[in-house]
From Swiss-Prot:
Compartments reported by the entry: Cytoplasm; Nucleus
Keywords of the record: Cytoplasm, Deoxyribonucleotide synthesis, DNA damage, DNA repair, Iron, Metal-binding, Nucleus, Oxidoreductase
Descriptive protein name: Ribonucleoside-diphosphate reductase subunit M2 B
Similarity comment text for this entry: Belongs to the ribonucleoside diphosphate reductase small chain family.
Chain segments carrying region Disordered: 1-31
Gene this protein is translated from: RRM2B
An example Gene Ontology CC term for this record: cytosol
UniProt source species: Pongo abelii (Sumatran orangutan)
Name of the top EC class for this enzyme: oxidoreductase
Amino acid sequence: MGDPERPEAAGLDQDERSSSDTNENEIKSNEEPLLRKSSRRFVIFPIQYPDIWKMYKQAQASFWTAEEVDLSKDLPHWNKLKADEKYFISHILAFFAASDGIVNENLVERFSQEVQVPEARCFYGFQILIENVHSEMYSLLIDTYIRDPKKREFLFNAIETMPYVKKKADWALRWIADRKSTFGERVVAFAAVEGVFFSGSFAAIFWLKKRGLMPGLTFSNELISRDEGLHCDFACLMFQYLVNKPSEERVREIIVDAVKIEQEFLTEALPVGLIGMNCILMKQYIEFVADRLLVELGFSKVFQAENPFDFMENISLEGKTNFFEKRVSEYQRFAVMAETTDNVFTLDADF
């Protein structure tokens, strides 16, 4: 992927062009406060980026584990689902189970090594932790619903067994491997992974909640979509701090590319019609989500799409940490977001 060949590089061979692109990116990295190497990266205090630190504390406050999701009521619902509904849900879970591992690959291989600001490194470290929880949760859901070992194995190997999952995975993996692209381009690409590639699937599971189905699955979906909304907001915050941002044209190109892949995934490869949703409205919803992401990145809308799903009005991807502040199901770690003075222990109380 990366930028088209520059005219001034037309006479260079491929290795020379690659070296030229890499050197140019290194120069640009040195101009970025977020990426500039410093011994300060080993020490958290004093906080230099309070808004980045606040997002880290939000992530910390919303930590949860797979064991806290009750799946005991899901199996009776699962057994009553139509074959098409089971097919759709199991394949969506297979996509999710693989995707969180890819997000973590990027965080470990690229972002955590490139970013030098300790507040952001704290966030990425916690994101890696919660992405592991997400992956475990999706694997546990597959393990609970799918009793046939061969079907289970097929789903756990979705990147190899399902071409449409592989297509989405390959798109993300190419960005991890791309040494020519700038940090800003890759921030946008992974905001698209978490903000666009996940959005339609989240909406499909919320649709099941609207129908009163699968309480364990839908509760875990609330928690995970809240987390991913925060991760997407964090990517947009990091983007705002960049000195050398990609052009609006380049950002649009990346996000529109992701939109096309996601629309194909949920309206052709794994159509939401299988669970009774409208494919045309799903296409519109994905465009709406993409427009919202573009606005949060500081650019104008491409699609001018309205939200066609009323039941998606209040979830995390709707806007800046809305869902977090709503505290889904009152689920937030006690005192993590409280002011320090709220939790001071004193010995002068009357007993």
